[in-house]
């Protein structure tokens, strides 16, 4: 019984530590990955209907279940 309790506490402690160690900076937590709008390279955002503000995006195209947003001069 105490082994189960110990493992449970270990898992809970690990989850708390992982959530506290997560970066708070928006630029650090950017969720985009590379994508292409024709020949223009952009950043893919899942489940978005418009490009997030504050990143300098000037255009976008529809991409699989989200958007591919690209900045000026791309």
UniProtKB/Swiss-Prot annotation:
- What is the annotated signal peptide range for this record? 1-21
Query: SUPFAM superfamilies, from UniProt?
Result: Defensin-like
Remarks, miscellaneous: Negative results: does not show effect on crabs.
Q: Name one GO molecular function term.
A: potassium channel regulator activity
Q: Which family does it belong to?
A: Belongs to the sea anemone type 3 (BDS) potassium channel toxin family.
Q: Which cysteines are joined by disulfide bonds?
A: 35-68, 37-61, 51-69
* Function noted in UniProt: Potently and selectively inhibits voltage-gated potassium channels Kv11/KCNH/ERG. Acts as a gating-modifier toxin that shifts the voltage-dependence of ERG activation in the positive direction and suppresses its current amplitudes elicited by strong depolarizing pulses that maximally activate the channels.
Tell me where it resides.
Secreted; Nematocyst
Taxonomy, top ranks, is: Eukaryota, Metazoa, Cnidaria, Anthozoa, Hexacorallia
Alphabetical UniProt keywords: Cleavage on pair of basic residues, Disulfide bond, Ion channel impairing toxin, Nematocyst, Neurotoxin, Potassium channel impairing toxin, Secreted, Signal, Toxin, Voltage-gated potassium channel impairing toxin
Which ranges of residues are annotated as propeptide in this record? 22-29
- Asked if the Swiss-Prot or TrEMBL record annotates the protein with the keyword Lyase, the reply is no
Q: Which organism is it from?
A: Bunodosoma granuliferum
Output the InterPro entries linked to this UniProt entry: BDS_K_chnl_tox, Myo_ane_neurotoxin_sf
Q: Name one GO cellular component term.
A: nematocyst
Q: What is this protein called?
A: U-actitoxin-Bgr3c
